[in-house]
A protein has these predicted regions:
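Alpha-helix-centered segments that form part of catalytic cores
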Residues: 111-146
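A short beta-strand/loop micro-motif in the catalytic core of glycosyltransferases
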Residues: 39-40
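Active-site gating loops and adjacent loop-to-helix segments of metal-dependent hydrolytic enzymes
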Residues: 82-125, 169
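Charged catalytic cores and adjacent phosphate/nucleic-acid-binding surfaces used
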Residues: 1-8, 12-30, 34-36, 47-90, ...
Length: 241
């Protein structure tokens, strides 16, 4: 067994709330410099910058995961981590069919830039990405699982788009076994307020949208000592808490 430093919640300049300088390549380089072993790119309702992130991670020696921060019909943010880049691209196309199409207004919401691994802009997403899909919470998890994803609610310790703030509590029988915290020190406080969190395995995600928001590693995950680190991480996340 071995322990790896992870951050499973990173945005790029494809997310309109992300800084235009947060290119997939820059994110990969900064994550490596910060000391991470594994990181996931999780833009809002999109996976279009994952290929560039993967190529950049390969050059930097960082293990990448392809992911998405999916917005459910209830406006809850859910992190979806996919087993391979190919499955992630397929999942992205599936989610596209459930997006509510509203034209992006870059001057108001921000740019939504597709990039290559050399920091070149290859296109721009015309429709606003972060708004809610038509997928309810359980339907979103069911769809993601069809593509082999590991899913869990994002930033449960945040008011905006956090499942606890939106729904008031966790479902009595949740379809997920993890919960993401932005600030690990808040977990004990939240366990007192929301006892249903207790059985869930806590994960850390910085939710970084800007280069200066990539923080020093503070969370490790114990995985099998395997040459395929990404597969070992996914296997660990699928295991029961």
């Amino acid at each position: 067994m071995r322990r790896v430093y992870t951050d499973f919640h990173i945005h790029s300049c494809l997310s309109p709330c992300g800084d235009d300088t947060m290119t997939p390549a820059l994110a990969a380089g900064l994550l490596k410099l910060a000391g991470y072993d594994v990181a996931a790119l999780t833009d809002h309702n999109a996976v279009g910058n994952c290929p560039a992130f993967f190529r950049a991670c390969e050059s930097y020696g960082l293990t990448p995961l392809a992911g998405m921060e999916l917005t459910t019909a209830e406006d809850v943010h859910v992190v979806c981590l996919l087993p391979t880049l190919e499955r992630a691209m397929d999942f992205g196309r599936a989610v596209d069919a459930h997006r509510v199409r509203i034209r992006n207004r870059p001057k108001f919401f921000g740019n939504q830039l597709y990039m290559d691994a050399e920091d070149n802009v290859t296109g721009e997403e015309p429709d606003l990405l972060p708004n809610a899909t038509d997928l309810g919470l359980e339907d979103a998890f069911a769809l993601a699982c069809e593509f082999g994803a590991v899913c869990y609610p994002a930033h449960v310790d945040r008011e905006a788009n956090g499942i606890l703030a939106i729904l008031g509590d966790l479902p009595e029988k949740p379809v997920f076994s993890h919960a993401e915290f932005r600030e690990p020190d808040k977990r004990e406080e939240y366990l007192i307020r929301y006892p249903r969190l207790a059985p869930l395995t806590p994960l850390f995600g910085s939710d970084a949208h800007r280069p200066d928001a990539i923080v020093d590693p503070c969370f490790t995950l114990e995985i099998a000592d395997s040459a395929d680190v990404a597969a070992a991480v996914m296997e660990r996340l699928r295991s029961k808490p």
